[in-house]
A protein has these predicted regions:
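Acyltransferase donor/substrate-recognition loop-hinge adjacent to the catalytic core
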Residues: 1-4, 51, 139-222
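N-terminal charged segments
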Residues: 4-46, 52
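Residues that form or immediately flank small-molecule/cofactor binding pockets and catalytic motifs
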Residues: 8, 60, 213
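Short, solvent-exposed loop/turn elements at beta->coil junctions and helix N-caps
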Residues: 27-31, 58, 161-164
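Conserved donor-binding loop and adjoining core beta-sheet/short helix segment
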Residues: 31-135
Length: 222
């Protein structure tokens, strides 16, 4: 397995065939990162593209050394321990050849899930201080295996800090399932204060519409 740089067009074509890829792993995201350069990478078995990633690079002043970061990536088959080991070994080889002294990534996979009601209950009880203390409703066995495998391969999970290179993503993400629900059903899922705020905004003339790229200049003026 090898890692090679690919074009943005090929990267986007690969993403189009995937079920779910973070927007932080699209070529467009690299263009928004001030102070970073970016490349699209491809994982190949022979000439078959089997994985892809956006890698962000930040140069150290005065020397040809780089900090590399793959936000919520790379996009690989994280469920296969054998594939993970080969893919990450190929990534490290690629990075070292290009002067990378520190390589960070954020696999876009989940380990534990909590239902909204579960979190509401423990918040009301006031018995815990962090989400990690709450017994999860679901556990992803593949995610647990990945947490064990990565340290064995030499990777270390660091604590997110408020300052630094801005190279960490939130470890806990709240997601609202919209599929199969009406607007009213979604609205009923909000707490009372949120519903009041939404109604107040509507009365004051706040509207929501899908924008286009032509709206960006107006957005930045605001």
């Amino acid at each position: 397995m090898q890692v090679r740089q690919i074009t943005s067009e090929r990267h986007l074509a690969y993403i189009a065939g995937r079920n779910s890829v973070s927007f932080l792993q699209t070529p467009a995201w690299g263009k928004t990162k001030t102070g970073w350069s970016s490349q699209s990478l491809g994982w190949f078995e022979g000439e078959e593209l089997i994985g892809a990633a956006l890698i962000l690079l930040r140069k150290v002043p005065k020397v040809e050394k780089y900090l590399a970061y793959l936000p919520e990536g790379p996009d690989l088959n994280w469920d296969s321990s054998k594939d993970v080991e080969m893919a990450l070994s190929a990534l490290v080889t690629f990075a070292k050849a290009r002067g990378v002294f520190q390589l960070k990534m954020g696999p876009h996979t989940w380990v534990r899930r909590w239902h909204a009601q579960t979190l509401k209950d423990v918040i009301a009880q006031g018995t815990v201080k962090t989400i990690g203390e709450v017994t999860p409703d679901e556990i992803n066995a593949n995610g647990i295996n990945l947490l064990k495998q990565l340290p064995a391969l030499g990777w270390r999970q660091r604590k997110a800090e408020a300052s630094g290179f801005g190279d960490f993503q939130p470890r806990y993400v709240f997601q609202i399932a919209l599929t199969g629900k009406t607007e009213e059903q979604i609205f009923e899922g909000f707490n009372q204060q949120w519903r009041r705020n939404i109604r107040k905004a509507e009365k004051e003339g706040v509207t929501v519409r899908q924008g286009t790229i032509t709206d960006l200049p107006t957005f930045h003026v605001c």
